[in-house]
Amino acid sequence: MMKNSSLLLGLDIGAYITKGVLIKGSSIVASLSIPTDKPAASASNVLKSLLDSVKEEKVTTVAVSGGGKRRLGESLLGKTVVKVDELQAIGIGGLTLAGKSQGLIVNMGTGTAIVAAYDEGRRITHAGGTGVGGGTLLGLSERMLGIRSFEELEAAARRGRAERVDLTVGDIVGGPVGIVPAEATASNFERIGAEASKEDVAAGLFNMVCQVVGVLGAMAAKAYRLEDDVIVSGGLAKSPLASSIIKETMSLFGISPVIPENCEYCTAVGAARSLRILKS
C-alpha cells in the first residue's frame, strides 16, 4: 500500500484540534494543527497543507485516528483513508516520540487516556483514563473566570498561587504524611473564597487537573510495572506549567515521566506509524 512513498501521513481529528504529521522513518518532517470545525473539512485542510509541503513525493494513503475519524469515508482528497484505533495510535505514537519499545502512555487531550504499550505498540492494553483533562480545564475556566483561551489561562495561573485556594497536608496535620510532603495538596479548592484572585483560581485549576492525571498515571504505572517507562503526551502536556505539575505529582511516587518533544502530536504520529508497525 505504501510502496510509492517513504513518507507516512497521519491525522488526529480531535474534539477541539485537528492535527496532522508527515513521518519519515520515526521522525516528523512536517506537522500542522488547526481548530476542529467540521471534522471532514478540518481534516481536508490539514491534509492539503501537508501534501503541498511535499509535492515532489507521492503519498497515496492517510492514516486517521481521533474521535472525528468516524465522519470520514474511504478516501480524502483522493487518498485512501485507513482508520486507526485511537488507543493503538496513542500507544504507537507515545513509544515513537519517546524512543522506547514499551511504556505507559498518559495521553492528556480533552480527557485523558492511559495505555500500556509493548513491542513498539504492536500490543496494547487500555489501562483506563479519566474525563479530567484539557476540556475540564477550559470548561471550568470559562465558567469560573470567563477565560476560554488556554494561553490566557496559563498566563494567569503563572501569576497566581494555588495554595491560596487549595488546602495542603501541612494545613491539616502540621507536617508530612507517609510519602506525601507537607506542601502537597490535601483538598483542591477547599480554601477558595472571595479573597482569592482570578490568578489564584487559575493556578488552582491547573493544580487540580494535572494532579488528578498525575496520580492516576502513577497508579497505573505501578499496576502495570512500567514505573521506569512512563510517557506523558497530548496537547495539555505541551504546556510548561501543566508538565511541571504532572512531573512534581508523579515524583511523589518515585516516577520520572518522559514528556517528549512534539508530545501534542502523539496520536497523529501513532496513526502514521501504524501503517508500518502493524504490518511488520
Labelled PLM ranges:
Residues M1-N4, L72, L77-V106, G111, ...:
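Conserved phosphate-binding catalytic cores of ATP/NTP-utilizing and phosphoryl-transfer enzymes
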Residues K3-S42, S49, R123-I124:
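Short glycine-rich, Thr/Ser-proximal phosphate-binding strand/loop in the N-terminal lobe
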Residues S6-D12, V59-A63, S101-N107, G129, ...:
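Short glycine-aspartate micro-motif
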Residues P35-T36, L51-E86, R122-H126:
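Short beta-strand-loop/turn "lid" adjacent to the catalytic site in phosphate-handling enzymes
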Residues V64-L72, A220-T249, E264:
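Glycine-rich phosphate-binding loops at beta-strand->alpha-helix junctions
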Residues G91-L97, L137-S141, E248, I255-S280:
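Glycine-rich phosphate-binding/hydrolytic loop that grips phosphoryl groups
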Residues G121-V177:
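Glycine-rich phosphate-binding loop plus the immediately following alpha-helix
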Residues G178, E183-D229, P260:
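Adenine-nucleotide phosphate-binding core of ATP-dependent small-molecule kinases
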